[in-house]
Amino acid sequence: MAAEEDGSSNMDSDWSGAPSFPGSEVSEEWVPVDEGIKLRVITWKPTSSKSASTVVFVAGWGSLFEGWRPLISEWSSERTIVYIETREKKSSEISKKISESDFSVDKLSSDLVAVLRFYELESTQIDWYSSSLGSTILIDSFNCGRLSGRSSILLAPNSEFKFPFWAKALIVLPLPRFMYPIIVRLAVWAVERKVKEEGQRIRYRRALLSQDLQKMHLSARSLMKYSLPDNLDGISFPCAVMTASSDKLHGMDRAMDIIDRIPNCKFIEVPSNQYAHEADVIKEIHHFQLLE
């Protein structure tokens, strides 16, 4: 097993460095959000165009920035983008002993509030873009009134986090570090069986090989106990769920159920999950946000 397959060595470059793109200025910071915890936040600001409202970007569980490079490389020349990496990712700096409770949706939600406070951003003025776990965190936060927005596009949200039986068994057990490479192999195998889109499969494999598996293990323990509230009537600003019928990992039926529960929620169907990571999706984003 190569060293990177336990999330420990030469994948660190995936979790640091501020990607620079034409037409924007970039900065990278580790923002304190909780005692002993800092999150990596990357910000792009257009150098020439007059930016519309700020986009705050919250990616999925363990998601690497590289998967979003095609979209952000284009989008950053016209919009100020604040890209937040949540605490289960390898990029988070954690200087305290951690437990399952440190990775609850409530904690992840509080982190977003702390980042907005750090940058003096008012949530009601934000256009949110999120994926998977990021979308779930936001739905929960919007519903309880912790966060709001000008608009929110929620790509492939999860109402709950279902793991295969064998994965549940591994998640609940205390695992020694030497087991981590085995877990990675099993996770890659499971994803490659489940995911049909080639681009999505490549992104997930790379992400799985790049994780801090202690963080991900504790995060999975917390998430497997979580589900969105049945009543999402607390959300009162424009939201859209974006998904693709080809995305078997997240599931169209689950996305449609969430749409039915969020008041006046719109549905944006895209050709593939990969499409939502590329620059072409900007036209769908603009249409929903009425920027075109």
What are these regions (language model features)?
Residues 248-254:
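Conserved alpha/beta-hydrolase "acid-adjacent" motif
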Residues 264-292:
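Catalytic active-site module of serine/aspartate enzymes centered on a nucleophile-bearing elbow/loop
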Residues 83-129:
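Active-site loop/oxyanion-hole signature of alpha/beta-hydrolase fold enzymes
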Residues 163-164, 180-233:
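Conserved alpha/beta-hydrolase catalytic His-Asp/Glu region
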Residues 139, 143-178:
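Flexible "cap/lid" loop of the alpha/beta hydrolase fold
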Residues 1-30, 42:
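An N-terminal hydrophobic leader/cap segment in hydrolases
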Residues 235, 241-243:
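Short beta-strand/loop motif that positions the catalytic acidic residue
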Residues 10, 37-94:
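Conserved HGGG/HGGXW glycine-rich cap/lid loop of the alpha/beta-hydrolase fold
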